[in-house]
């Protein structure tokens, strides 16, 4: 894997150098308000000197993350495009998926429908504006490895409809709603599509070092705002609750365990925080109160958090 990382690093450096020669915005940077996206924006704007457009999809972003977004945009003085889809669309989507999960549970089911919507919106904006590359703050292991290592394949961006089959076949969503998923066939022949790259797959990744750095750079109001627990999407608390209930474990545990084994995250931190997070979720206390808030927003009852779909029902193409 280290050999692959070094190959990606060489490509990343060449790509950034090529971006400097383009006119207009030289890169679109996905900005969610989490630690990785904040640091990514800083690195590309300050360390590499790119003329970037920050891009945020305003859907289920917590107040803490919005504070960090506004603070970072002000510090770095970059242009910021916010795409705000109808809230009802996401309410409908989340509720449907939680009622009709596939066997890998709620986090997998919802995240891998939710993420392609964000990614597709970024591709749409970059294509419209002639921006050559989209950079996203995915850490190693995100998204699913079979879907992306370092960047999305050209076939995926240029020739593949991203509409999840399980949604398309459900009859619950209109053609207009499904059209929000990326489909390059809607564009005229000869359209130039951007690349979509995850720089943290190429750079040395260290979760604690990134937190230290964005605190030092004053991109967050306080250190706690850099925590992946605090800046998490509110609906994620409900997803984890559903998986603890239906699967008996938190599906983020393998991801963080892999980062710890690779020396990219702190064992000491997650040894304490992982059981604390699960306890907050189970008891709906402190940040775990988001479980109740999100269930009320989605008008869901606990018994409706069901697994009733076959494996891969919503898998995006890869």
State the predicted function of each range.
Residues 1-24, 43-318:
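Nucleotide-activated chemistry modules centered on ATP-dependent adenylation/adenylyltransferase
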Residues 39-40:
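Hydrophobic positions on the alpha1 helix immediately C-terminal to the Walker A/P-loop
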Residues 27-36:
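Short, glycine-rich nucleotide/cofactor-binding loops
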């Amino acid at each position: 894997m280290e050999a692959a990382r070094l190959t990606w690093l060489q490509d990343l450096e060449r790509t950034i150098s090529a971006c400097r020669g383009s006119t207009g915005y030289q890169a679109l940077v996905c900005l969610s308000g989490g630690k990785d996206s904040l640091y990514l924006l800083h690195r590309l704007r300050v360390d590499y000197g790119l003329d970037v457009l920050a891009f945020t999809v305003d859907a289920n972003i917590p107040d803490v993350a919005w504070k960090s977004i506004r603070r970072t945009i002000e510090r770095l003085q970059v242009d910021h495009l916010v795409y705000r889809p109808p809230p009802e669309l996401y309410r409908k989507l989340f509720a449907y998926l939680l009622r009709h999960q596939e066997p890998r549970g709620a986090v997998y089911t919802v995240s891998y429908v939710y993420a392609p919507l964000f990614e597709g919106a970024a591709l749409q904006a970059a294509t419209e504006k002639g921006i050559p590359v989209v950079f996203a703050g995915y850490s190693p292991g995100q998204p699913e490895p079979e879907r992306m290592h370092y960047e999305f394949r050209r076939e995926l961006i240029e020739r593949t409809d991203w509409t999840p089959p399980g949604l398309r076949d459900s009859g619950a969503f209109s053609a207009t709603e499904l059209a929000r998923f990326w489909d390059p066939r809607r564009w005229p022949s000869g359209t130039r599509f951007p690349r979509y790259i995850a720089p943290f797959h190429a750079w040395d990744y260290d979760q604690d070092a990134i937190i230290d750095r964005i605190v030092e750079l004053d991109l967050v109001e306080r250190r706690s705002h850099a925590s992946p627990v605090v800046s998490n999407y509110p609906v994620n608390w409900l997803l984890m609750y559903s998986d603890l209930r239906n699967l008996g474990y938190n599906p983020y545990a393998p991801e963080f365990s892999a980062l710890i084994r690779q020396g990219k995250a702190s064992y000491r931190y997650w040894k304490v925080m992982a059981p604390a997070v699960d306890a907050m979720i189970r008891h709906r206390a402190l940040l775990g109160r988001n479980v109740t808030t999100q269930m009320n927003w989605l008008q869901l009852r606990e018994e409706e958090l069901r697994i009733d779909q076959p494996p891969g029902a919503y898998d995006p193409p890869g």
